[in-house]
Each structure stands twice: as structure tokens, then as C-alpha cells.
């Protein structure tokens, strides 16, 4: 049988006449990671021909007719290419590229066209750092997933917010091919800290543990006292009393002498008041919010001797002087050689002071004072034996001179008591007592008043703790 020429587009399937199959395409080896190829495109798969019809010839051979693939496939591939280009163009806009970079990226995406192409704009990285993996699965993954794979393999990524290179702990031999700017290791943490400290000049703040702490200061009292009885009462110790206790407590009391006409030692009641105050303070040492009037009230409850007395109880808490007074005993606060503050005598009339008697409630009689003190202030607390014979400004002058002579509080108190007794012995001259007598009509009275004298001098000083 004569051989018929094969029509164009027909395949000869006779024995030994089959056309040899086309050679298989060469396998495309996957490019190693971090290999720099600006355009890495996988070979597109060739579409298989469609069987159009078959015809049996007279010699028994069969002729098959094949046709090109349908246009639907071409349209589908074009659509897939368009879908791949769209997110790439959007990525270019989001990454903030300028006009020239965007124009360069768009043709690159169009030229790729293949299903296996991955571009730099898809992952937000530079083109040289992107590796094409080939196949449709590579394009199916999003740009975020590709970036996550690169970071997990120990690559270097750039943080767009902080513009700082962050490097994962894993490293491969391929990292050696990276540019020198990415291969520089980060500086040690110590160098970074030192640089920050130098720029912000915070070395002094961070080295506070090396600085010697400054000791805090507080104000305290240094107190001393002196007592001089009336010469006629020296055998019994006089009728005045005082106490000095810890933590800035002190006080004076002056027993009323009229009790002596009934054979009662007025000084006993005054001393019991002072002893009771000191005892209560010592028993409650360190307790907070103890007020002078509470101390006085407690001492008055425990006094058993008959009699009456004027009394003053005071406390310095480191800032304020708190004082409770009944009668004509009192205090002066001397600052810079002048009388800064003073108590006011509580009297019914001339030489007739208020007084507390056994069974009385001192809280109904007491007058309270609160005065803020400073370093260098001097408190002179005394019975009327001082204030009846020495003027207030004279007391301030004596205290100022004593401080210049560096005398101690006890020595200052002794000088004041001696001065008061000296003036009390005088029958001439003006005194606070003679002025008060003349003011109420005792004409021709002059000189001082000899009496018991109790003086407590307290100096406010700084104490380093």
C-alpha cells in the first residue's frame, strides 16, 4: 500500500512510523537561597495539544487530528498574570517608593509574566535579596509569609519603623555573600549603653550608688536649768520646781506661797507636778501625738500633796514649740538678740495669778501655744521670779552675749537666775514688778521682788543624723 503523505497537523501512527516524542524539558534546578538574580523566572510548562478528530484510512491506519489548546486557557493564564501583577504594584505604593523606583518596578513585574516569578515588591525587600522558588505555589504565598520565611532562616531584615537592622540567631554559609553593610556585626551592648550615657550625660544619675549620701538634719534642743530659792526658804528648797526630759520636753512650776500660812509646804505640790510630768513622758517615750496639756493633766491627777501652783509644760517636736501654760510662769523665744515670741501672763489681777490646785481639771484653765522655731533660737522658760525682776529685752541681751561667749544652756540659766535675785534684793530702780505696781495704783513702789527663781534655757540646734 502506497504511503500517503501526512497531512499537516496529522500524526503518523503506523508501525515504525510514529514520530519520536519530543525530548523532555531540562529540569530547572532551584536556585540557592540568597543567590542574587534580579530576574529569576521558572520555565513555563508547555500546554498539551487537544485531540480534535480521528480517521481510519484504507490501509487500516488511523489518523488523529490535533488542535491547539483552547483560547480559554490563554485567557486564564493572562488573568493569572494580571492577578500576580496587581498586588506587586500595590506593594510598590505601600512601600513608599518614589516615582522612579515605582516605574522601574512596574515593567519588571510585567516582564516576568511567569507563574513562578517572585519580585522584590511582593515581599517588600530589595530585588537582590529575593530568591525565586519557582512554581505556582511560590506566587500563591503572600508577601508577609515570604518575609517570615526569610527571617526564620537567619536572614537580616530592616525594621521600617526604627530603621535598625535586626538579625536572627541562626546563620548559614550563604550569609557570607551578603553586602558588607549587612555583614557588620552589631556593637556590644556595653558600647551601646556607654554611648547613650555619654550623649544623655546620665553617668552621674546611674552612679548614684557610688555617691556619698548627704546626711539629713533635724532640729533638737539643748537644755539646761538653774534654781535659786528665796533666802528665807532655802532650808526647804523653795517653792519652785522644774523638769527636763528626753525628746525636747521641759517645764517649770511655782508653788503658791500663801499655803505656808496654813503650815503647808507649797513647794511639795509644785515638785509633784514636775515629777509626774517627767514620769509620764518617760513611760510613753516614743509615743506619737502626746500633747503638753495631756501630760499636765496626767500629772495633776497623780499629785497627792495639798497646795496650788502655776505651771508650764512645753515640748519641741523638731519644728514647733508646743506649750501649755497656767498662771504667770512663762517663756520667751529669742531670735537674733530680740524677743521673737512670748507667752502672756494669766492673772486675776496684780500679783494674783491663775493656778492649778489639787482636784482641778487643768484642761479648763490651760492656754496653749504653737510656735515654729529655727536653728539658733533660744527659749527661756521661767517662773515669775525672773520676769518680775528682769525686763524681757534685758533677758534677750544677756542671752545674746552668753551665746557669743559660747556658754552652755545651764550656765546661761545660772546667770539669769543670779541677775534676777540680785535685782530682787534691790529696793530702788525700775523693774517689771514695780511698773506693774504703779500701773494699778501702788504709788511710790520701786525696786524688785525677792522670790524663788526657776529658769530653763533651751537652745535650738541642728543635729546631723
Curated annotation (Swiss-Prot):
Mn(2+) 1 binds at residues 254-255. It comes from the Eukaryota. It catalyses: O-phospho-L-seryl-[protein] + H2O = L-seryl-[protein] + phosphate; O-phospho-L-threonyl-[protein] + H2O = L-threonyl-[protein] + phosphate. The keyword Isomerase does not apply. InterPro entries: PPM-type-like_dom_sf, PPM-type_phosphatase-like_dom, PPTC7. Its EC number is 3.1.3.16. It holds the Pfam family PP2C_2. Residues 14-47, 68-119, 133-191 are annotated as: Disordered. Residues 18-30 have a biased composition (Pro residues). The keyword Manganese applies. Keywords: Hydrolase, Magnesium, Manganese, Metal-binding, Protein phosphatase. Disulfide bonds: none annotated. Its cofactor is Mg(2+); Mn(2+). Residues 222-460 form the PPM-type phosphatase domain. Signal peptide: none annotated. Binds 2 magnesium or manganese ions per subunit. It is an enzyme of class 3 (hydrolase). Mn(2+) 2 binds at residues 254, 384, 451. Belongs to the PP2C family. This is Probable protein phosphatase 2C 71.
Amino acid at each position: 500500500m502506497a504511503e500517503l503523505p501526512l497531512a499537516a497537523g496529522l500524526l503518523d501512527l503506523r508501525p515504525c512510523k510514529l514520530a519520536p516524542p519530543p525530548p523532555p524539558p531540562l529540569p530547572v534546578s532551584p536556585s540557592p537561597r540568597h543567590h542574587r538574580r534580579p530576574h529569576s523566572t521558572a520555565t513555563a510548562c508547555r500546554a498539551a495539544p487537544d485531540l480534535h478528530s480521528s480517521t481510519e484510512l484504507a490501509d487500516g491506519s488511523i489518523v488523529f487530528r490535533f488542535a491547539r489548546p483552547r483560547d480559554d486557557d490563554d485567557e486564564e493564564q493572562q488573568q493569572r498574570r494580571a492577578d500576580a501583577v496587581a498586588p506587586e504594584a500595590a506593594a510598590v505604593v505601600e512601600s513608599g517608593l518614589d516615582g522612579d523606583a515605582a516605574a522601574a518596578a512596574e515593567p519588571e513585574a510585567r516582564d516576568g509574566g511567569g507563574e513562578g516569578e517572585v519580585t522584590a515588591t511582593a515581599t517588600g525587600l530589595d530585588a537582590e535579596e529575593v530568591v525565586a522558588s519557582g512554581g505556582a505555589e511560590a506566587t500563591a504565598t503572600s508577601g508577609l509569609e515570604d518575609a517570615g520565611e526569610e527571617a526564620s532562616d537567619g536572614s537580616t531584615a530592616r525594621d521600617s519603623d526604627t530603621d535598625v537592622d535586626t538579625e536572627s540567631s541562626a546563620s548559614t554559609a550563604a550569609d557570607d555573600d551578603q553586602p558588607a553593610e549587612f555583614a557588620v556585626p552589631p556593637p556590644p551592648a556595653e558600647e551601646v549603653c556607654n554611648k547613650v550615657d555619654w550623649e544623655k550625660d546620665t553617668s552621674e544619675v546611674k552612679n548614684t550608688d557610688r555617691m556619698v549620701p548627704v546626711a539629713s538634719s533635724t532640729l533638737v534642743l539643748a537644755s539646761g536649768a538653774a534654781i535659786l530659792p528665796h533666802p528665807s526658804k532655802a532650808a526647804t528648797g523653795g517653792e519652785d520646781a522644774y523638769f527636763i526630759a528626753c525628746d525636747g520636753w521641759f517645764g517649770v512650776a511655782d508653788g503658791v506661797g500663801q499655803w505656808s500660812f496654813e503650815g503647808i509646804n507649797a513647794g511639795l505640790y509644785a515638785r509633784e507636778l514636775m515629777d509626774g510630768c517627767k514620769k509620764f513622758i518617760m513611760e510613753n517615750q516614743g509615743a506619737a501625738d502626746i500633747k503638753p496639756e495631756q501630760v499636765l493633766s496626767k500629772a495633776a491627777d497623780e499629785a497627792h500633796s495639798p497646795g496650788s501652783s502655776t505651771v508650764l509644760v512645753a515640748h519641741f517636736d523638731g519644728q514647733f514649740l508646743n506649750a501649755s501654760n497656767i498662771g504667770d510662769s512663762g517663756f520667751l523665744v529669742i531670735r537674733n538678740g530680740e524677743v521673737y515670741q512670748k507667752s502672756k501672763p494669766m492673772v486675776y489681777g496684780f500679783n494674783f495669778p491663775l493656778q492649778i490646785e489639787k482636784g482641778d481639771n487643768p484642761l479648763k484653765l490651760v492656754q496653749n501655744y504653737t510656735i515654729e522655731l529655727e536653728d539658733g533660737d533660744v527659749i527661756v522658760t521661767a517662773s515669775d521670779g525672773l520676769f518680775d525682776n528682769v525686763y524681757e529685752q534685758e533677758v534677750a541681751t544677756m542671752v545674746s552675749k552668753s551665746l557669743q561667749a559660747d556658754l552652755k544652756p545651764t550656765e546661761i540659766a545660772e546667770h539669769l537666775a543670779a541677775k534676777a535675785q540680785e535685782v530682787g534684793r534691790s529696793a530702788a530702780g525700775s523693774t517689771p514688778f514695780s511698773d506693774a505696781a504703779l500701773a494699778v495704783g501702788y504709788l511710790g513702789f520701786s525696786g524688785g521682788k525677792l522670790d524663788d527663781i526657776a529658769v530653763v534655757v533651751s537652745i535650738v540646734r541642728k543635729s546631723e543624723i
